[in-house]
């Protein structure tokens, strides 16, 4: 039947322990997992795409089936170019579900061969977002429990 290939898209600015938890869990299910790093045109990023990709590569180095790439355009189109049959999305709370359901429905309309898989976050990360990490760090708050160590150092360096 071939490899089970999935895409997990996000801006990952920066990658958090919540993101990493979803990536690690998805990597157990899929043979190949593409982490696609996106630019969100409505946000000014703290890190460049290249910096984000490098951090993700470092924190996922223990996952041999994970590949990190940048992507633009529609995620469903990117997934198709990679031979993926699934898009993985993490859900923190019910509030995430409505937005994600709309995107999943649109993706299904655009390409019925690609399924969306929702993965509930570990409850200890249910409050966690990249935006929150940046806000806490901006005011010299401790983010060491929220992000991997190399990300913590990189974020702290941005706010010195």
UniProtKB/Swiss-Prot annotation:
The keyword Cell wall biogenesis/degradation does not apply. Its main location: cytoplasm. Signal peptide: none annotated. ATP binds at residues 11-12, 19, 90-92, 100, 125-131. Keywords: ATP-binding, Coenzyme A biosynthesis, Cytoplasm, Magnesium, Nucleotide-binding, Nucleotidyltransferase, Transferase. It is found in: Cytoplasm. One of its GO terms (biological process) is coenzyme A biosynthetic process. Belongs to the bacterial CoaD family. This is Phosphopantetheine adenylyltransferase. The lineage of its organism: Bacteria, Bacillati, Bacillota, Bacilli, Bacillales.
């Amino acid at each position: 039947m071939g490899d089970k290939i999935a895409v997990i898209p996000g801006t990952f600015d920066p990658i958090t322990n919540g993101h990493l938890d979803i990536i690690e869990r998805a990597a157990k299910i899929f043979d190949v997992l593409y982490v696609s790093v996106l630019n969100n045109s409505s946000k000014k990023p703290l890190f460049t795409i290249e910096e984000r990709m490098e951090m993700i590569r470092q924190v996922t180095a223990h996952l041999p089936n994970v590949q990190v790439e940048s992507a633009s355009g529609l995620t469903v189109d990117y997934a198709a170019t990679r031979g993926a049959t699934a898009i993985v999305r993490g859900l923190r709370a019910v509030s995430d579900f409505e937005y994600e359901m709309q995107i999943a429905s649109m993706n299904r309309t655009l390409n019925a061969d690609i399924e969306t898989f929702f993965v509930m976050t570990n409850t200890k990360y249910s409050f966690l977002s990249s935006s929150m990490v940046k806000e806490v760090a901006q005011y010299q708050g401790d983010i060491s429990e929220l992000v991997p160590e190399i990300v913590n150092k990189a974020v702290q360096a941005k706010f010195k």
